[in-house]
Regions:
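Nucleotide and nucleotide-moiety/phosphate-recognizing core
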Residues: 1-101, 105-133
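YjeF_N-associated NAD(P)HX repair module
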Residues: 91-183
Length: 183
């Protein structure tokens, strides 16, 4: 899990308005810390909490840095389409994928799978950088197999070391450009 060190390796190419999609584990925590770093650097950052619980210390750091937090309470992004809360999803110059990471097992289900489907659909209509932390959400870390819905990344930040799912076919097609980030 990322330390709130202020290290900005791998984020210098992100535009001025970033939206993160945050799951309940360390991957979501890393996304919140990334938003905090970006916000402290003057970049507008919004984080959508997709699970009822999230990484509390990272959430506090993001809030302290001025990140806009939108808590969906475990509901899918589909629940906010055509509402004012949808604007930060649609207007963002870049997205950070912190939904699930290497600790996830099996395909995405329920609201998370539905949210990823919504994001993939919107990304096809309005392309933008999609930055995954460790692995794109929905990829398994073990063998690179495609077992369900996966958020297609344009960039993947390999934290600490490269992961097998980032480089093994057919999953490699979902990782985009891969950058090694050391903390």
């Amino acid at each position: 899990d990322a330390e709130e060190s202020g290290d900005d390796d791998g984020v210098d190419w992100i535009a001025s308005r970033v939206t993160a999609f945050v799951g309940g584990g360390d991957n979501g925590g890393d996304a919140l810390y990334a938003c905090a770093i970006l916000a402290r650097g003057g970049i507008g950052a919004t984080a959508y909490l997709l699970k009822k619980r999230c990484h509390r210390r990272a959430l506090a750091a993001a809030q302290e840095a001025g990140v806009r937090i939108i808590d969906l309470g475990g509901q899918s992004l589909r629940s906010i389409e055509n509402t004012p809360a949808w604007s930060e999803v649609f207007l963002a110059h870049a997205w950070i994928d912190g939904i699930v990471g290497t600790g996830a097992h099996g395909p995405l289900t329920g609201a998370l799978a539905e949210s990823v489907e919504v994001l993939n659909r919107l990304s096809a209509i309005k392309p933008r950088p999609v930055i995954a932390i460790d692995v794109p959400s929905g990829l398994t870390d073990d063998d690179g197999a495609i077992t369900g819905t996966i958020l297609r990344a344009t960039h993947t930040l390999a934290v600490g070391t490269y992961k097998r799912a980032q480089v093994l076919p057919p999953a490699v097609e979902f990782s985009g450009n891969i950058s090694l980030v050391t903390m």
